[in-house]
Amino acid sequence: MKRVKKLWGMGLALGLSFALMGCTANEQAGKEGSHDKAKTSGEKVLYVNNENEPTSFDPPIGFNNVSWQPLNNIMEGLTRLGKDHEPEPAMAEKWSVSKDNKTYTFTIRENAKWTNGDPVTAGDFEYAWKRMLDPKKGASSAFLGYFIEGGEAYNSGKGKKDDVKVTAKDDRTLEVTLEAPQKYFLSVVSNPAYFPVNEKVDKDNPKWFAESDTFVGNGPFKLTEWKHDDSITMEKSDTYWDKDTVKLDKVKWAMVSDRNTDYQMFQSGELDTAYVPAELSDQLLDQDNVNIVDQAGLYFYRFNVNMEPFQNENIRKAFAMAVDQEEIVKYVTKNNEKPAHAFVSPGFTQPDGKDFREAGGDLIKPNESKAKQLLEKGMKEENYNKLPAITLTYSTKPEHKKIAEAIQQKLKNSLGVDVKLANMEWNVFLEDQKALKFQFSQSSFLPDYADPISFLEAFQTGNSMNRTGWANKEYDQLIKQAKNEADEKTRFSLMHQAEELLINEAPIIPVYFYNQVHLQNEQVKGIVRHPVGYIDLKWADKN
């Protein structure tokens, strides 16, 4: 039987993550015969696949899976998600919380070190968090700093840096005051956006994060080689405070975006983990070396409400109702995903003990006849005799192409609508989507911390994750209220109202909720894949 790990009931821990999946890569990445060298030297070397070139190793800038997966292993925050996916002491050895649950005081470990030998100080955290919020920095993850009192005002240009309530009281004491109590803040600070930055290094070389020979980290591993668009090598860090826990000597990350090539490399021993290609899922999913782990997040499509014809709500809803999520997961992706009929994924427990998704139910379902009615109504409202030309854009990757083709065919069959497909390389795609250059595009979302609000805040007006042009004052107010509501029952009610409004106005089409399906070398143990968060190799071992 396959190894299936169900992790939701353990209480999700925070982590970060937005993860639009990547596109192109060098398919020869990592094929250098280094495996044989590792065997003869007796080194424990883990071979994994990052799929694509990281966007950036500058903590608040990367803000995607291909950057933060490796970064989570070469840097570390005040807390780290443990094997049970709950936050545990990391750079901070302890902390205390005020009676009003708004002020946290963290004590930095005396033996916390950077890879260059400098001590990690409370000042490095104060510097990093204010750097993340600096409006001149333009960090997409800056909204995560809005938990801090004065953070949003500073980032929006309405406040001053000195008014951001995070202060290094001395080298080992960091004090931070929140806008409102947040029960999940200890998980938030495990997020890569909250990683420290060595102030002296950053001021001496503002591009310290761009190359392996200038990178300065503080995690279990140190970055030793970065062959751009090819591979990343990291080695066990001798300066890490908990180095005795780290069993691996090296980790080599390939950059191979094609899932079939990824699988072939696993079969030939060039990778220790691999994805399961959809076309092989029927024969592979029942193997003993397959791990299936729940993961928060979903695959979906975005409409640009500023481009015709998607300024019309009824036309958007018609497209959304024409999509059959069950067909896609059964016949296209074929990796045991759950169809998504709302935006917030399963795995978040309410005060009444129910799962948020179970309580909220299915908010949109395939309905061809209703979709046709809505399309006709929308076209009349816009005085369309014929819809404007429609292009669906996706990032260049076989998996994205297959889903886009299925959507294209479904819209043709159900609504008689012709949709043109277009694709582009990952980094260009990402920048153009942020700039609202697409009419209709593929997307994905991983929550930044383990709470439904992490999903829902993404569609507030002006949020860097919105990328649809959609704005709704009522929705913004519901999110603001939920973020500041102390009563959990009321808070969850506000979040349900917000999700219903989002799905009803349809700036998006949910497709499926994520899981993590991996083949894994049976000699490898201890890789931790968090339902909310990034792969953690601190505890990994290889016989």
From Swiss-Prot:
Localization: Cell membrane
Lipidation (N-palmitoyl cysteine): C23
Key words of the record: Cell membrane, Lipoprotein, Membrane, Palmitate, Peptide transport, Protein transport, Signal, Sporulation, Transport
InterPro entries: Peptide/Ni-bd, SBP_5, SBP_5_CS, SBP_5_dom
Gene Ontology, cellular component aspect: ATP-binding cassette (ABC) transporter complex; periplasmic space
Phenotype upon loss of function: A null mutation abolishes the ability of a proline auxotroph to grow in a medium containing the dipeptide Pro-Gly as sole proline source.
PROSITE patterns to which the protein is assigned, alphabetical: PROKAR_LIPOPROTEIN (PS51257), SBP_BACTERIAL_5 (PS01040)
Induction notes from the record: Nutrient deficiency conditions.
Family: Belongs to the bacterial solute-binding protein 5 family.
Protein name: Dipeptide-binding protein DppE
Organism, scientific name: Bacillus subtilis (strain 168)
Lineage: Bacteria, Bacillati, Bacillota, Bacilli, Bacillales
